[in-house]
Every structure is written in C-alpha cells, then in structure tokens.
Regions:
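Membrane transport/envelope proteins' first extracytoplasmic loop
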Residues: 1-75, 84, 155-158, 325-337
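Interfacial "coupling" helices/loops that link adjacent transmembrane helices in transporter permeases
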Residues: 12-17, 76-115, 349-391
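Short cytosolic juxtamembrane segments of multi-pass membrane proteins
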Residues: 3, 185-200, 452-463
Length: 463
C-alpha cells in the first residue's frame, strides 16, 4: 500500500497543493514561536536579561501571547483543510475499495497520505521559519523590553522535531473523521461521484468538543463584560483584552459548528435571492449542494474576518481612549497589524484551498449548464454570485465577534474611569471581505477555461 499511496500523491498533486501550502505556512508560524520560546529560556539569554535589569519572564510573555493567537487560528485551519482534502478525494479511496483493498488498508493509506503531506510541507515551513525567526524575536523583544537589545536565535533539533510533530499530528487528527468515512464509502462512488450535498452530521467527538468550547465562550463572555478592571499603571488599566479572547473563542466555535450551523444560515439569508432567478438561483443551489465544503470554507473565511475585526477594533478603541483621555501612552500597532495580516491570510488561504478542491466536480457542473443552454458569460456570473454568497455569509457570522469586541472593550475602559469611546473596525473588516471575495472569485473562475475547451461529451462521459 505504500507504493500506491506515493503514486496517488504523485498523480493527484494538484489536489494536494492547497493543503501543502496551508501546512507549510502553519509549520512556519509554529516554528518561529517554538524558536522564540527556546531562545528566551536559554541560560545565556536569561543571564543577559537580568544583567540589563529585565525580568526574564517579561521576555516569555509576548511569545506566549502570540503563540496562543497563532494556535487559535492555525489548529482549526490545518484540521479543516486536512479533512476537506480527504473528503474531496473520497472517490479515489472508493476506487481502492473496488480494487480489493481492505477497509483497514484504506484507512491506513489515507492517514499515511496526510502524514506524508505534513512531512513534505514542513520542509518549506521550516525554511520560512529560519528566515522569519530572527525578525520575529526582535519584534517580541522590543515589545517586552526595549533595553534588552539584540537576541540571536538559532534552530535546534528540539524545535525542528516539535514543529514536525505538531503539524503532522494536527493534520492527521483532522483527517481521522473523513478517513473513517472513506472506509465506509460504497463502491458505487468509484464509478460516479456522489453529490457532495446533503446534511453532514457532526461526530460525537466534535459535538463534545463544541459543547466544551461553548461553555468556555460563555465563561469568557462573562469575564469580558462583568470582570472589574485591574489596577492602573501610569494611568492605564490592566486586565484588558478579554473581549478579544471572547471574540476569537466564538469564531473558533463557528468552525466547530460549521457543518450544522452554516448551511442553515446560508439557506436562510439567501432565500430572497432565489427569487431573482438566473445566476442567483443557480449560484445559491450550487453553494447549498456543496454544503459540506462550502461550510468549511465559510467557517475559515469567518475566522479570518473575525480575527481581523477583533484585533483592529481593539487597537482602534485603545488609540481613541488614549487620545480622549490625553494620556502619554505609546501604542505600537504595527506589530499587531502584521500578526493580524499573517493569521488572517492563513485562514483565507485555508478557505481558498477548500474551495479549490471542488474544481473537478465544477467542471462537470459547468458542462451540464452549457448543455442546458447556458453561456460562458452566464457561468461566470454564477461563479461571482457564489463567491459573494460565501463572503456574505462569513460577514454575517463575523458581526458577532465585531459587536462583542466593540462593546466589551468600550465598556471595559468606561468601567476603569476612562472615556466611553466606540470604534468598531468596520473599514479593515470590509477590506478583508473584499480581498476574500476577489480571491474566491479568481479560484472559482479558474476551472472555466479548461471546462470550455473540453468537449461537453468528454466531461459528461464520467457521469
């Protein structure tokens, strides 16, 4: 089975390319966080910090904060992309069953395939970490203590091993559910793709995790809106940022509940668009027909937009409060905005990878539409509307984290005796939504030229 697994990877590299890109970026982010952690805990760095009058713990805290936010985005993205890729190639696994492979062999082959992808992606990811580790450490050192000076970082066997283990483990765990489903795939799907529609049920493990996560969200919302501010240092209250954490927890909860929540939401709010007919009706049905992959893509889009909304709203609120209270406090927004851009781009890349995996079925769909009399221009309009449906649903979901962050941050500073200022980050949210729409439109339009050049009969022959 090892030979067949490697051959499948070689022949289906286009289908795996999006997954490899996401895993590589995740490996790079994880690697720089691990390198920073190992660096600031080295004995020579601890001694240098004490000699400079800096508490060594101050060097560790920024790295932990960044690593936490990175994990909040990276783990859901890697898990969702891994399981979506396995699900998109379920017909290939059914072919193996039809050829006589045992269920346990198919299960082992699927998980081995994902593990190999994780190993391959770690190579460019670690190279990316090698380049970004030093600037990353310099930024965090400046945030912790400007007087600390230059800290030289270096890769170690421990950081390399942990990077590989974390990336491969998360990818494989995310693929376990779809791999088990692939084992139970009827052999008839080997000769004809089953429609990807239908309501996807959440597994027991996912339900339990979602329930635990929902309780964590409720507790964090309680802290964000009711916990008193901490003592003031130089006129600035401590204990802030609880609303950001609540918003991120809610965004991850949406990813966990995506199979059950997002198709219903998409069906509900897009119902009036079906009355417009034409491309609107076809695009809506296409999105609902792919409810499984579209739910995963929309969940990751909502994660990207929600993270941007939470962080930019918090930064705008802090800056407005400082100006209104006339405080002499310097707020460094560049580093936070760079972090938001990187993690938001990763979630967007994950959504693009999930959408791109459906290119094979889209070519057949375009052929059916052309056979029914639709023109290439009509198909393009349908694709644009479908991308708008994805982004519109993600925007609706992101309104909740935006409102939570805006209200929570404003009320926190008001309870601390600061001016009540409301600064929702609407502009950055709309900008990210526009970039997401343009990117998804480009990805959805990509299969059209190939589909138009291929004869309709050749495309439909597989049906």
């Amino acid at each position: 089975m090892t030979r067949y697994t490697l051959r499948a990877l070689a022949t289906q590299w286009r289908a795996w390319s999006g997954t490899v890109a996401v895993l590589a970026l995740a490996a790079g982010l994880i690697n720089v966080c691990l390198v920073h952690r190992m660096t600031v805990t080295r004995p020579d760095v601890v001694a240098a910090a004490r000699a400079a009058g800096v508490d060594p713990a101050e060097l560790v805290v920024p790295g932990i904060s960044v690593a936490f936010y990175t994990a909040m985005v990276t783990i859901p993205v890697v898990a969702v992309v891994g399981q979506s890729c396995v699900q998109a190639l379920r017909t290939s696994w059914a072919l193996w069953r039809l050829a006589g492979a045992l269920p346990r062999q198919v299960l082992a082959a699927v998980l081995a395939t994902v593990a190999v992808l994780g190993l391959v992606a770690c190579v460019p990811g670690i190279l990316l970490g090698q380049v970004a580790a030093q600037p990353f450490a310099s930024v965090l050192t400046r945030l912790a203590a400007a007087r600390m000076g230059w800290i030289e970082v270096a890769q170690t066997p421990t950081t390399l091993l942990l990077t590989v283990v974390i990336v491969v483990a998360v990818a494989v765990l995310g693929a376990v559910g779809p791999a088990c489903a692939a084992v139970r795939t009827p052999a008839v799907e080997a000769v004809r793709d089953a429609a990807p529609g239908g309501r996807r049920r959440m597994g027991v493990g996912r339900r339990i995790l979602a329930g635990v996560w929902a309780h964590a969200c409720a507790g964090q919302l309680f802290v964000a809106f009711l916990a008193p501010p901490g003592r003031k240092i130089d006129g600035w209250p401590t204990g802030g940022g609880q609303a950001i954490l609540a918003s991120l927890l809610l965004a991850v909860l949406v990813v966990l509940l995506a199979p059950a929540l997002i198709p219903r939401l998409l069906r509900l709010w897009s119902a009036p668009l079906a009355r417009l007919g034409g491309p609107w009706l076809i695009a809506r049905r296409s999105a609902l027909w792919r409810s499984e992959s579209s739910a995963s893509a929309i969940g990751l889009l909502a994660l990207a937009i929600s993270f941007t909304a939470a962080l930019t709203t918090s930064l705008a609120t802090v800056q407005a409060v400082v100006e209104a209270a006339r405080l002499n406090v310097a707020i460094n927004q560049v580093d936070s905005l760079v972090l938001a851009a990187i993690l938001g781009a990763m979630a967007l890349l994950g959504a693009v990878a999930v959408v791109g995996m459906s290119s094979r079925s889209r070519q057949r769909e375009f052929a059916v539409l052309r056979c029914a009399g639709s023109t290439v221009r009509g198909v393009c309009r349908q694709v644009v509307v479908e991308a708008a449906l994805y982004v519109g649903t993600a925007l609706l979901i992101s309104l909740v984290p935006l409102v939570v962050t805006t209200a929570g941050e404003s009320l926190f500073y008001a309870r601390a005796g600061m001016p009540l200022v409301v600064r929702p980050g609407v502009g950055p949210v709309l900008l990210v939504a526009l970039l997401s729409f343009l990117t998804l439109t480009a990805v959805l339009l990509a299969p059209i030229p190939g589909a138009t050049r291929t004869p309709i009969g050749a495309v439909l022959a597989a049906e």
